[in-house]
């Protein structure tokens, strides 16, 4: 792999994906492991490949990603966000393809905090009339 790369960060919930894009042939490594090993579920693999498929650049770049925090779904969406932003670093003209489908938008929804006197953020404790 060459030393020339484009870097971008993707986030979702508490997951952070640091993405490096190298010119290459389409291999994706996440935390040093192949995509298929790190995310065995096909649906998550599809989510990660979406920006590359949408821009028709699936076999043009090698991607190395360090991802931490969150769960598997949050991590997959953070990786998608990171790849989209890295592609934008390479070619700003891709914005017109990536922006309308929402790949560049940071999903800012976070877990709502638990309130005292309640069982969860909004759920009440079960009430027994008798």
Curated annotation (Swiss-Prot):
Gene Ontology cellular component list? cytoplasm; small ribosomal subunit
A Pfam family matched in the record: Ribosomal_S9
MF terms per GO, please? RNA binding; structural constituent of ribosome
InterPro entries, per this entry?
Ribosomal_Su5_D2-typ_SF, Ribosomal_uS9, Ribosomal_uS9_bac/plastid, Ribosomal_uS9_CS, Ribsml_uS5_D2-typ_fold_subgr
Per its UniProt entry, which superkingdom is the organism in?
Answer: Bacteria
Q: Which residues form the signal peptide?
A: none
Which GO terms of type biological process are on file?
Answer: translation
Q: Sorted alphabetically, which keywords does the UniProt record give? A: Ribonucleoprotein, Ribosomal protein
Protein family per UniProt: Belongs to the universal ribosomal protein uS9 family.
- PANTHER family per the UniProt record, alphabetical: RIBOSOMAL PROTEIN S9, SMALL RIBOSOMAL SUBUNIT PROTEIN US9M
- Cite the HAMAP family for this sequence: Ribosomal_uS9_B
Q: What is this protein called?
A: Small ribosomal subunit protein uS9
């Amino acid at each position: 792999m060459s030393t020339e790369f484009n870097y971008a960060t993707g986030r979702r919930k508490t997951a952070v994906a640091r993405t490096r894009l190298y010119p290459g042939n389409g291999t994706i490594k996440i935390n040093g492991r192949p995509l298929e090993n790190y995310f065995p579920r096909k649906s998550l693999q599809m989510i990660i490949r979406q920006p590359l498929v949408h821009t028709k650049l699936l076999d043009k770049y090698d991607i190395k990603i360090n991802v931490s925090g969150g769960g598997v779904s949050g991590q997959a969406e953070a990786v998608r966000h990171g790849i989209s932003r890295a592609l934008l670093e390479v070619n700003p003209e891709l914005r017109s393809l990536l922006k309308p489908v929402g790949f560049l938008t940071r999903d800012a929804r976070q877990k709502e905090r638990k309130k005292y006197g309640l069982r969860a953020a909004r759920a009440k404790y079960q009430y027994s009339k008798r």
